[in-house]
Amino acid sequence: MAFELVGLDRLGTRMKIIFVRHGEPDYRELEERSYTGFGIDLAPLSVKGRQQAQELSKNSLLHSADLLVSSAVTRALETASYVACATGLPLRVEPLLHEWQVYESGVENFEKARTLFLENNGSLPPNSPFQYETAEEMRSRFLKSMRKYRNYQTVVVVTHRMLMRQFVPNEKIDFCQVIECEIEI
């Protein structure tokens, strides 16, 4: 697993964030039943994803935190449960740490919107064929949701790749990858 320290300048109280991307999910059962939108977010971790989360939970860096905050999405929450059991950290579920929102249905539309998002540096071009959450909206959503945790110096945040990418320069973020950064909340 890769570990990095990234400094970011924002307004307010300085907080060390230990970002963790969730483990590999298994969408098969939900896809077989044609779940879409937030329904697909009910997917649990795959067998490999559980192994990744178990390995992640051995990371000594996680023990340096004061609190564990997780997205309410099943794959993130299941990953966080392994971390909570291994570290004894108190766990808070934060519904606003969900994955990037695309206001179109279907995997194909999601991927097309993702390509458009990346090509436009996170902005939504005028007359875009796809509607989605911009990078600025994601950053704002994250910062607003984390304000209530200002009294904690170091927080583990189990969340999703697109949200993490708004705060760290990594283009590729693997399942259960750990990335440290400091953010002004």
PLM regions: where:
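Acidic, low-complexity terminal tails and accessory targeting/binding regions
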Residues: 3-16, 59, 92, 97-114, ...
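Active-site-proximal alpha-helix that buttresses catalytic centers in soluble enzyme cores
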Residues: 16-92, 176-179
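Histidine-centered catalytic micro-motifs
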Residues: 19-24, 158-164
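Short, active-site-adjacent cap segments at secondary-structure transitions
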Residues: 26, 76-77, 100, 163-165
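Phosphate-handling substructures
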Residues: 29-30, 34, 39-44, 85-141
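Glycine-rich phosphate-binding loop signature in dinucleotide/nucleotide-binding domains
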Residues: 61-64, 149-153
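Short, well-ordered beta-to-alpha junction loops that form the rim of enzyme active sites
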Residues: 70-74, 96, 158-162
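His/acidic metal-ligating clusters that form di-metal
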Residues: 143-150, 157-162
